[in-house]
C-alpha cells in the first residue's frame, strides 16, 4: 500500500507525465505492516501545509481507495504544529461496475535480480508504469481492481524499472509489435503473460574482451570518473543508489552530475526549471549523497536544456542590450542556485562553461562564425559570476572547454578557476575505416599540439572528458547515414540515435583504447 498525495514526498512530481497525471507510484512512500496487521508510515511535513492524500495499491488513479458509494476517496487536512497520529480506514479498492483483472507474469531467467517489474496501461494513451508484486523467482503478479467503470478497452505491456520506452518486453516493440488488450467485464479475468526477451537487453555470462596496452598505475590525484547524462526522468530515482555502486565498481573516483534548467524561450530568453524534464533539487541532493556514500568525489556541472537546436536558438534571439541583460541575469540565477545545492550536498567541485554558452563569452561568436553581439561587459559578468560562486561554494571550480571549438581563444577570466574540464569533440581519424594505431597517433598529436599547450599556458590541471558513439564512422565524426554522414557534437547532446546509422561496438572500443 502506498500513500500518494499533493506533495513531492507523496509522489507528486508537479509535472505533465504520461497520461496527464502528475504522480508517480514509484516515488510514493510504501506503508509498513505491523504485527497487528495495520499499515503505517511516518512523514515529516511543514506545519500549516494543506495536505491532500489517498491510499493506493497503484498510482492513485489505478487501484486507488474508493468510498462506500464507489467514488474516489480523497482525504485532506492542515498539518498541525505538533506530532500527530492519523488513523484511517480503507473501505475498498474497487469501484462499482466491472470486476478485477489479475495478471500473472513470468519473466526471463536473465532478468537481473536487483530489478523490479512494472505494468504499463493504455486506456486512452500510455500512462506511467506501476510497480507490481513479486511472488516467486522470475514470477510477478498484479490485480487491477479499479477504476474499471471509467475505461473501455485497455492495452498493456510489461517492462523493467518503469522504463517502458526501452526496457520493455521485446514483443511489444519493433516493426510488428504485439499489442495485448483487455476489456473490463462483469466477470473476473485472469491474464497470463510470458516475457521471452527484453528489448535491447542481451546479457552474457562471457566477459567482453577489450584489447588494450598495459596501464601503468597513476600518481595520486589522478581522476577517473563518469559524467552522467543530463536528460532525466523522475522515475529514475530508484536507480541512483545501484548506479553509484556500479560506478564505484568500475574503479572510478569521480561522478559528474549534470542538473539542468530548461531554455523555453529566446525572445525574451527564459531559463527556468521544468518539473519532469529537469533534475529537481531533492533528486540532485539524493544523487550526490548516494555518490558520496560510495566514497566518490562529486562535481556538479549545470547545463542548459534547449527545446530546439542550440545554434538555432542563439541565432533566433534579438541579442540587443536588454536581451543580453536578461540572459545574464537568468543564467546567473541558475548557476548560483546550483552552486548553493552543491555546497549543501557536499560536492567537491563545480563546473561551468561548455559548448552551449559560447556566444555569451567575451568577443563571442555564433555557431556559424558570425559575431554574437555580446556586450563588452561580458568579461566582467563572468568574473563576477565566478566570484559569486566562490562566495557560496567552498570546493574547486573548473571551466569546461569545448575542444576543438574556439579552444585557442580562452577568456581572461579563466585565470580565476582552479582546473579545466576539456570536453573532447575532435575526430580521431580522417578516414572512414581507421585502425587503432592511427587513432592513437592522432590522439597523441592533438594532446601534444593543443591540449598540453593550453594547459601549460594557463598553468591549470585538467581532466579530459570523452564520449564516443557506438556507430560506424564515429572516429571521423562522420556517422554513416543514407545521405552521407551525420555529425554529432556530444557536448551539445547527451545521446543520439538514428535509424539509418550502423552500430559498431568495435570502433567504439578502439576509440576508447586509443
Which residue stretches match the model-derived regions?
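Aromatic-rich carbohydrate-binding modules that target alpha-glucans
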Residues: 1-50, 56-79, 106-151, 161-183
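Structural recognition of the beta-strand scaffold that forms the well-ordered cores
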Residues: 2, 224-228, 253-259, 299-302, ...
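Compositionally biased low-complexity segments at domain edges in trafficked proteins
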Residues: 82-115, 184-217
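Boundary/entry segment of secreted carbohydrate-active catalytic domains
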Residues: 203-247
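Substrate-binding cleft and catalytic face of glycoside hydrolase catalytic domains
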Residues: 209-218, 250-270, 282-367
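Short, acidic/polar
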Residues: 233-248, 328-341, 404-413, 510-514
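A solvent-exposed, charged loop/short amphipathic helix patch at secondary-structure junctions
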Residues: 265-273, 318-322, 366-372, 433-439, ...
Amino acid at each position: 500500500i502506498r500513500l500518494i498525495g499533493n506533495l513531492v514526498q507523496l509522489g507528486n512530481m508537479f509535472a505533465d507525465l504520461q497520461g496527464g497525471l502528475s504522480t508517480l507510484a514509484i516515488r510514493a512512500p510504501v506503508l509498513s505492516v505491523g504485527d497487528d496487521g495495520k499499515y503505517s508510515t511516518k512523514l515529516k511535513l511543514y506545519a500549516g501545509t494543506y495536505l491532500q492524500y489517498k491510499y493506493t495499491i497503484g498510482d492513485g488513479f489505478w487501484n486507488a481507495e474508493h468510498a462506500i458509494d464507489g467514488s474516489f476517496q480523497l482525504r485532506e487536512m492542515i498539518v498541525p504544529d505538533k506530532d500527530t497520529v492519523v488513523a484511517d480506514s480503507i473501505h475498498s479498492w474497487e469501484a462499482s461496475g466491472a470486476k478485477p483483472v489479475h495478471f500473472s507474469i513470468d519473466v526471463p531467467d536473465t532478468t537481473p535480480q536487483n530489478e523490479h517489474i512494472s505494468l504499463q496501461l493504455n486506456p486512452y494513451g500510455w500512462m506511467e508504469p506501476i510497480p507490481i508484486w513479486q511472488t516467486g523467482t522470475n514470477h510477478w503478479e498484479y490485480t487491477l481492481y479499479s477504476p474499471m467503470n471509467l475505461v473501455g478497452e485497455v492495452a498493456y505491456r510489461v517492462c523493467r524499472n518503469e522504463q517502458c520506452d526501452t526496457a520493455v518486453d521485446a514483443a511489444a516493440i519493433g516493426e510488428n509489435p504485439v499489442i495485448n488488450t483487455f476489456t473490463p467485464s462483469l466477470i473476473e479475468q485472469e491474464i497470463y503473460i510470458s516475457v521471452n526477451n527484453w528489448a535491447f537487453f542481451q546479457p552474457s555470462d562471457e566477459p567482453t574482451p577489450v584489447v588494450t596496452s598495459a596501464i601503468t598505475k597513476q600518481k595520486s590525484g589522478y581522476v577517473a570518473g563518469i559524467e552522467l547524462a543530463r536528460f532525466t526522468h523522475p522515475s529514475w530515482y530508484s536507480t541512483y543508489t545501484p548506479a553509484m555502486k556500479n560506478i564505484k565498481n568500475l574503479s572510478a573516483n569521480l561522478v559528474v552530475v549534470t542538473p539542468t534548467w530548461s531554455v523555453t524561450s529566446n525572445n525574451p530568453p527564459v531559463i527556468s526549471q521544468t518539473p519532469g524534464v529537469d533534475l529537481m533539487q531533492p533528486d540532485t541532493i539524493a544523487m550526490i549523497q548516494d555518490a558520496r556514500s560510495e566514497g566518490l568525489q562529486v562535481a556538479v556541472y549545470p547545463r542548459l536544456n534547449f527545446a530546439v537546436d542550440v545554434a538555432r536558438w542563439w541565432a533566433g534571439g534579438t541579442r540587443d542590450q536588454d536581451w543580453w541583460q536578461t540572459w545574464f541575469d537568468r543564467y546567473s540565477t541558475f548557476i548560483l542556485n546550483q552552486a548553493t545545492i552543491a555546497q549543501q550536498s557536499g560536492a567537491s567541485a563545480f563546473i561551468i562553461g561548455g559548448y552551449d554558452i559560447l556566444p555569451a563569452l567575451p568577443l563571442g561568436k555564433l555557431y556559424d562564425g558570425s559575431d554574437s553581439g555580446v556586450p563588452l561587459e561580458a568579461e566582467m559578468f563572468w568574473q563576477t559570476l565566478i566570484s559569486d560562486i566562490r562566495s557560496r561554494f567552498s570546493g574547486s571550480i573548473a571551466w569546461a572547454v569545448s575542444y576543438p571549438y574556439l579552444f585557442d581563444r580562452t577568456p581572461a577570466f579563466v585565470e580565476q578557476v582552479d582546473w579545466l574540464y576539456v570536453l573532447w569533440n575532435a575526430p580521431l581519424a580522417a578516414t572512414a575505416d581507421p585502425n587503432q594505431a592511427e587513432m592513437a597517433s592522432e590522439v597523441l598529436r592533438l594532446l601534444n599540439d593543443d591540449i598540453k599547450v593550453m594547459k601549460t599556458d594557463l598553468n591549470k590541471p585538467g581532466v579530459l572528458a570523452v564520449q564516443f558513439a557506438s556507430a560506424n564512422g564515429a572516429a571521423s565524426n562522420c556517422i554513416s547515414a543514407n545521405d552521407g554522414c551525420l555529425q554529432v557534437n556530444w557536448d551539445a547532446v547527451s545521446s543520439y540515435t538514428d535509424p539509418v546509422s550502423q552500430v559498431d561496438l568495435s570502433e567504439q572500443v578502439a576509440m576508447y583504447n586509443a
